[in-house]
Amino acid sequence: MKDKVYKCGYKQCKLGGKVNKDIAVKKGNRYYHSECLQEIYNKEQIRELFLKHINPTEIISLLNRTINQIIDVKKVSSEFLLYALEYVIKNKLPLNRAAGLYYIINNKHIKNDYMKQKAKEIDNKIRNKNVQSNNEVKFNLFIQDNTWNRIIER
């Protein structure tokens, strides 16, 4: 029996546009790849952060066009753009317009900080896997008598 195949609901799907039922994520009446749905959430969060912290009077269509241009045409990951915007807000760097997003994605300090953060996340994942794989508990019991000889040996 064939698996049911749905069309991914994300217009800019980078994974071929078709998603199998076993890996599909449903939101509303549409089915998405998990990566596509994460990108949609990231874009929404970028939009909200920009309008809340940077410029609430920015034209929405211009902001959307800029975000789509950066993510879809320039092939910058939505995670990096979200991180860069959070970095600008946290460090109070100057950013007034949506066109300024082009400049923050090329900032060397932001790129280096992002790479360090990603390296830490990967390191933590590796450590967690190693901890989970070593579930065997080794317990050794050494019975020692409490005598003056033991105190003198130390």
For the regions a protein language model found, what residue spans apply to each?
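Short metal-coordination and nucleic-acid-contact micro-motifs, chiefly zinc-binding Cys/His arrays
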Residues: 1-9, 26-29
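Short, well-structured alpha-helical interface segments that form or flank functional binding sites
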Residues: 3, 65, 99
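Short cysteine-rich clusters marking metal-coordination/redox-active sites
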Residues: 5-13, 33-36
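Residue-level marker of positions within ordered structural domains that often coincide
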Residues: 13, 38-41, 106-109
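Intrinsically disordered, low-complexity coil segments
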Residues: 15-18, 58
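Canonical RING-type zinc finger of E3 ubiquitin-protein ligases
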Residues: 17-26
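Long, charged low-complexity interaction segments
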Residues: 25-76, 133-154
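Short, cationic/aromatic linear interface patches
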Residues: 79-135
